[in-house]
């Protein structure tokens, strides 16, 4: 079923499909009236439209529904509800009467707001309608019969049915007829809730006295009713408290005139303010920790001295007249710089300076007199200000001396430093050790170990001290040149005897003619030796000496990263001397490394290999020899030429 079929109003097309006239909103609970009255200015009463109490009595009791329906937890409407325009007034009247008579129905906040608005406009109707207490008693008796407690179970009451309400009552009210739109200036001003109490406070016109008195009477009669459980049910809640507004009195302003006693007190305050020293200076002086009793005595003595030195001057009439009626005491500000001096003091100081002036002085007497007077005034002021400071400093010095004495005693006792005997490190591998013994003391009950002896071992060999080198005087440049010339001459002489090859005549080994001789090369300079490349290898060699078939010698050069492959020594004995570089040698199954000036051999019948592991070329001087007699016996051929 649609909404238009159930309603008495014929269906018509509207731009706004959410509301129809005379229909209660499904969520908001507002009832849209047929016509809205306008004021003299042509404005609609929007306050009454939005403060409509359509949801006031939606939870009222309905006797017929309660009798027919079984007890359920919640009721849901099966179809939307509609109301005719003719039945608006009756339904609204019945709902308002039943809501006033039934105390169990909670008052809607919209109703309370609308009633408060009427009261603020000055309507004659009461804010809250008085209720008969007999109705509460009768209803309590009826509800007591309905709700019964069986053990811990409680029967559930059926939910109250909803009822549709219109606003005919509000239309007929006097406020509605005399409606005029209010301006923002006519609205009640916002006043804070916490206002101070004062005799000049008056009640705000927004809440007239008549409405407030009626509200107080109703609240006094209708306080609270206790239910079956013994708890208080509050049926009325104050929505807004009466506000107070401050209104200016038309009475003449009352000025407080100071009395004679008040004047005297103010004069004393000004005097005390003028004679007080600077509080910041006192605080800075009192920052040292000093007993309060000593400070109070010192300050009292200093104040008496200051009174004798600088007596208080009488007040002038201008200072008394400056304190006006109703004004606070003027704050005396201290000017910067030194205070001005009186003319009498300057004159006296000038006379004394002229009397004591020495002849021949360059500066005039007046300047000297001014300086003397300034020094006197400064000394008087400094004495009064620093009297308390000097006393405090003396106390602080005494305290510091006591603290230093305590610290010295602590160091003697051994609080800051331990009494442990300090021992240099011991060479335990030389059997150096510490010998302890038990020390018994009358004051100490247990015996404590103490160091008896430290055993140290001296070196058997005496230390040889190196003597200081004698410092020779610097030689002159002539002597240095002569030494260089001598060295150059020696080199030239050596070069004259230096040769690439050395040939000489030697005896030849011959059994038949032992005196036979021959000429042979017996020496070479290595730079003059010409090296030859070995085929299929990176090695270079030069055969220098040969004695067939038993002996041979020469030089081998290996570049960086080169390697001589593994070869057998056979029946020869080989020896090598490293002239330059670093090599890695393998003899049989052993590998080792050698560098310059190293020598090694390869015995008969072993395999060997050589590898250059350095970054530069390696030079080796090699020799190999064989036993000819043994070779003949075994039937071995001539001397091999392998290198």
Swiss-Prot record:
Residues 332-341, 360-370 have a biased composition (Basic residues). Residues 166-185 have a biased composition (Basic and acidic residues). Its main location: nucleus. One of its GO terms (molecular function) is kinetochore adaptor activity. GO terms for biological process: attachment of mitotic spindle microtubules to kinetochore; kinetochore assembly; mitotic sister chromatid segregation; spindle attachment to meiosis I kinetochore. Residues 55-209, 224-386 are annotated as: Disordered. Pfam families: CENP-C_C. Keywords: DNA-binding, Nucleus. Residues 333-345 bind DNA. The keyword DNA-binding applies. Residues 235-261, 295-304, 313-322 have a biased composition (Polar residues). InterPro entries: CENP-C/Mif2/cnp3, Mif2/CENP-C_cupin, RmlC-like_jellyroll, RmlC_Cupin_sf. It comes from the Eukaryota. It is found in: Nucleus, Nucleoplasm. Residues 85-97, 104-125 have a biased composition (Low complexity). GO terms for cellular component: chromosome, centromeric region; condensed chromosome, centromeric region; kinetochore; nucleolus; nucleoplasm; nucleus. PANTHER family: CENTROMERE PROTEIN C. Component of the inner kinetochore constitutive centromere-associated network (CCAN) (also known as central kinetochore Sim4 complex in fission yeast), which is composed of at least cnl2, cnp3, cnp20, fta1, fta2, fta3, fta4, fta6, fta7, mal2, mhf1, mhf2, mis6, mis15, mis17, sim4 and wip1. Belongs to the CENP-C/MIF2 family. Component of the kinetochore, a multiprotein complex that assembles on centromeric DNA and attaches chromosomes to spindle microtubules, mediating chromosome segregation and sister chromatid segregation during meiosis and mitosis. Component of the inner kinetochore constitutive centromere-associated network (CCAN), which serves as a structural platform for outer kinetochore assembly. This is Inner kinetochore subunit cnp3.
């Amino acid at each position: 079923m649609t909404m238009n079929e159930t309603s008495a109003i014929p269906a018509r097309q509207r731009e706004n499909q959410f509301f129809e006239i005379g229909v209660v909103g499904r969520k908001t609970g507002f009832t849209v009236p047929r016509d809205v009255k306008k004021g003299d200015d042509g404005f609609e009463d929007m306050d009454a439209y939005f403060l409509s109490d359509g949801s006031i009595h939606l939870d009222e009791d309905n006797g017929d529904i309660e009798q027919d329906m079984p007890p359920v937890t919640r009721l849901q409407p099966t179809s939307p509800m509609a109301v005719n325009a003719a039945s608006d007034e009756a339904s609204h009247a019945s709902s308002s009467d039943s809501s006033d008579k039934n105390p169990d129905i909670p008052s809607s906040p919209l109703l309370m707001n609308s009633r408060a608005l009427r009261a603020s406009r000055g309507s004659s109707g009461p804010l809250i309608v008085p209720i008969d207490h007999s109705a509460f008693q009768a209803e309590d008796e009826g509800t007591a019969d309905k709700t019964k407690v069986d053990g811990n179970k409680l029967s559930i009451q059926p939910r109250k049915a909803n009822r549709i309400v219109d606003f005919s009552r509000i239309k007929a009210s006097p406020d509605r007829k005399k409606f005029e739109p209010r301006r923002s200036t006519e609205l009640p001003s916002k006043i804070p809730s916490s206002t101070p109490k004062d005799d000049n406070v008056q009640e705000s016109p927004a809440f007239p006295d008549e409405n407030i008195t009626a509200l107080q009477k109703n609240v006094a009669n209708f306080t609270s009713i206790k239910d079956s459980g013994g708890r208080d049910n509050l049926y009325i809640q104050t929505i807004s408290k009466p506000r107070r507004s401050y209104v200016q009195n038309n009475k003449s302003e009352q000025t407080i005139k100071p009395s004679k006693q008040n004047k005297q007190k103010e004069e004393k305050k000004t005097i005390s303010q003028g004679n007080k020293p600077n509080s910041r200076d006192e605080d800075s002086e009192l920052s040292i920790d000093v007993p309060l009793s000593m400070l109070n005595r010192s300050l009292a003595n200093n104040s008496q001295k200051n009174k004798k030195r600088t007596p208080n001057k009488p007040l002038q009439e201008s200072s008394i007249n400056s304190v006006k009626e109703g004004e606070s005491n003027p704050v005396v500000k201290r000017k910067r710089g030194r205070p001005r001096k009186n003319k009498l003091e300057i004159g006296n100081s000038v006379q004394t300076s002229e009397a004591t002036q020495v002849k021949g002085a360059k500066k005039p007497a007046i300047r000297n007199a001014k300086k003397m007077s300034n020094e006197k005034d400064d000394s008087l002021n400094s004495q009064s200000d620093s009297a308390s400071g000097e006393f405090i400093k003396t106390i602080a010095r005494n305290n510091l001396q006591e603290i230093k004495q305590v610290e010295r005693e602590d160091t003697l006792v051994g609080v800051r430093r331990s009494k442990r005997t300090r021992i240099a490190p011991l060479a335990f591998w030389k059997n150096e050790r510490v010998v302890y013994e038990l020390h018994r003391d009358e004051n100490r009950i247990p015996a404590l170990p103490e160091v008896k002896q430290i055993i140290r071992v001296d070196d058997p060999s005496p230390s040889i001290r190196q003597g200081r080198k004698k410092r020779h005087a610097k030689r002159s440049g002539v002597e240095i040149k002569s030494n260089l010339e001598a060295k150059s001459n020696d080199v030239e002489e050596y070069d004259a005897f230096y040769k690439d090859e050395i040939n000489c005549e030697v005896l030849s080994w011959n059994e038949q003619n032992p005196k036979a001789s021959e000429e042979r090369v017996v020496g070479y300079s290595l730079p003059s030796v010409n090296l030859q490349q070995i085929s299929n290898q990176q090695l270079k060699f030069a055969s220098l000496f040969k004695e067939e078939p038993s002996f041979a010698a020469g030089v081998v050069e290996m570049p960086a990263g080169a390697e001589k492959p593994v070869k057998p020594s056979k029946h020869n004995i080989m020896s090598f001397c490293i002239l330059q570089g670093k090599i890695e040698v393998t003899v049989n199954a052993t590998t080792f490394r050698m560098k310059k000036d190293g020598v090694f051999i390869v015995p008969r019948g072993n395999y060997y290999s050589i590898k250059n592991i350095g970054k530069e070329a390696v030079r080796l001087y090699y020799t190999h020899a064989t036993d000819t007699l043994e070779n003949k016996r075994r039937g071995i051929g001539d001397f091999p030429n392998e290198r």
